[in-house]
């Protein structure tokens, strides 16, 4: 069983896996280590991209990302997603690094958890701020899991590519098979929208 993006990259490299659905960071690793190639991408809400975001509770006193990285944010609690998450860890960490901020030193406590837990804990005021992705926040609001007015977006990344369907380097050489895979994915796409 593959349980990490690194494991999936190795599985594609050694021929155990021929086709995989993976997030942006997983694809970067798989392309780098196994020369995996994208053959399709997923459209969510009709769009090929999404955004990393940082959220806070409106009562936290953190009204902007400048507050978060400035003296007002020092000593606060910040939550990242797991360390393999593009939107929950890598992109926000990159932003902090660009600002000269080491999260482990700037914040009083840094936690690593699941995307839904970040939103739930921020809205409950259990953590001051956290990293997530826009679709997760929207979905949780739509499903009534959190209230929009209790989760304030204070930062948004540049667009990030959605999940990719990638194939091994060996499979990619078979252009006829790649075309059949692409056609099959396109054919089942509407059915997945009806019955996910």
Segments the model singles out, each with a brief description of its role:
Residues 19-21, 40, 55, 77-79, ...:
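Structural recognition of the beta-strand scaffold that forms the well-ordered cores
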Residues 13, 17, 32, 70-73, ...:
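Sec-exported extracytoplasmic/periplasmic mature domains
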Residues 21-34, 97-98, 123-124, 128-149:
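A ligand-binding cleft/hinge motif common to bilobed small-molecule-binding domains
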Residues 18-20, 27-51:
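Short beta-strand-centered segments that line the small-molecule binding cleft or hinge
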Residues 43-53, 145-185, 189, 195-196:
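Periplasmic-binding protein-like
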């Amino acid at each position: 069983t593959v349980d990490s993006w690194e494991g999936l990259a190795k599985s594609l490299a050694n021929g155990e896996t021929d086709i995989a659905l993976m997030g942006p960071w997983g694809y970067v690793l798989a392309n780098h280590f196994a020369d995996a190639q994208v053959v399709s991408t997923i459209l969510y809400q009709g769009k090929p991209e999404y955004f990393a975001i940082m959220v806070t509770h409106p009562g936290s006193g953190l009204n902007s990302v400048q507050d978060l990285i400035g003296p007002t944010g020092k000593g606060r609690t910040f939550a990242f997603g797991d360390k393999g998450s593009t939107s929950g860890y890598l992109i926000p960490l990159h932003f902090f690094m660009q600002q000269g901020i080491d999260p482990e030193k700037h914040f009083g406590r840094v936690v690593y958890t699941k995307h839904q837990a970040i939103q739930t804990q921020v809205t409950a005021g259990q953590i001051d701020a956290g990293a997530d992705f826009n679709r997760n926040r929207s979905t949780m609001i739509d499903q009534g899991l959190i209230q929009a007015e209790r989760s304030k977006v204070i930062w948004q990344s540049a667009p990030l590519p959605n999940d990719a369907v990638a194939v091994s380097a060996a499979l990619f050489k078979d252009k006829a098979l790649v075309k059949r895979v692409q056609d099959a994915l396109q054919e089942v796409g509407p059915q997945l929208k009806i019955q996910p």
